[in-house]
Amino acid sequence: SQGAKPGLGGQLMAKKVTQELADIRGIPAGIDLRSPSRHPDILGADDLVIKVEELREATGYKLPVSVKLGAGRVRDDIKIAVKDGFDFIELDGMQGSTGAGSAEVIDYVGIPTLAAIIEAEEALAEIGRRQDTQIVLMGGIRDGIDAVKALCLGADAVAFGTSAIIAGGCIACMQCHVGQCVTG
């Protein structure tokens, strides 16, 4: 779940589901693609441990397994992620740019990105796991200044999602969810 719309799934409008995308996802082209807000086979923390192990097996134990948390219940979620054995945690704050969420959700749900890293740091300190847990912060990291702030507050790395899609042609008109973006 993205930090800009925690707890919600995603939807890609039918006209954006090209044949190439359909082949990759194993779905028919030209129909709405809806992604659930959660994995249907993960009902609790115990199921999450099993999923981590399944992913490790699928990659031959050669790749790290991470979890992306939409910043909401940061303290609790960080502790669960550490207990369940993820190699690193991606923490996504509410300030990420998404056109796939409603204005109400984007404006009023979630926790600001930099505040999220502070809560994560405190949660890791409470359980004595800060030294062996890597956190990648994302969601509203727009430039080098934001990245430096995040690193100074405790993030081990930052990720730039919006910058990458803008470099790819997105004009940030925030109309993804209604299919009216002029760039497609």
Model-derived segments and spans:
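Glycine-rich phosphate/ribose-binding loops and adjacent secondary-structure elements
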Residues: 39-184
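Active-site beta->alpha loop and helix N-cap motifs at the rims of alpha/beta catalytic domains
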Residues: 2-5, 27-48
